[in-house]
Amino acid sequence: DPFNEILINKSINNIKSLNIFKSVEKEIIDDANSKTKIINISIEEKPTGEIMASAGFGTEGGSIGFGVKENNFVGQGISLDSNFLLSSDSFKGKFSVTNPNYKNTDRSIYISAEAIETDNYDTFGYKTNKTGISFGTNFEYYDDLYLGMGNSNFYEKIETNSTASARQQAQEGSYWDSFIKLDFNYDKRNQKFQTSSGFRSFYSIDLPIISDTNTLKNYYNHSYYFDLFE
């Protein structure tokens, strides 16, 4: 392919945007014999993992939390995030994995599982438990237009007693929600890392497949980038 300085810089910028290298440098060498250019890319790795632990105590009880986050799991750019928070009346836990280039197909895939429980049965007369799983994929469908498709499924159970409010008692029961998620991302930024010009339009919609409330969720965001000072 013909040498293109713009495409080279874009590739270097895409590597930097992965946020798993401390530095990324390029060297372009002219080969007079073959009349080609040799491109050497030098990278320096950086720590990409985080471990979090927390603990708190108060008049209404205590809480403990723990989390592990890794942006370059097994050296393949896979993002892993796992955390939980436990208190005297609640539990929140989540585990998610994202592979940005599944089997070198330029498609990202993700899966996430989470659980939330709130136990106020003795104090306010209600208890809720919600668990679910989400999975999907993202890929470039057309030039600079990225399409995301996913599915989320959640099961929720609500228990109440006579001390709960009338509204809470009316909500008692089991619920199953299943949604199809579609994302449309039109990305015309000049570069992903330290963007200085261009725009990005993002639209997301969650369509109910099975839902007691038949809630449809929409989200739209448009960002425009420019330099304040030259």
Spell out what each predicted region is.
Residues 2-202, 215, 225-227:
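Gram-negative/organellar outer-membrane beta-barrel architecture
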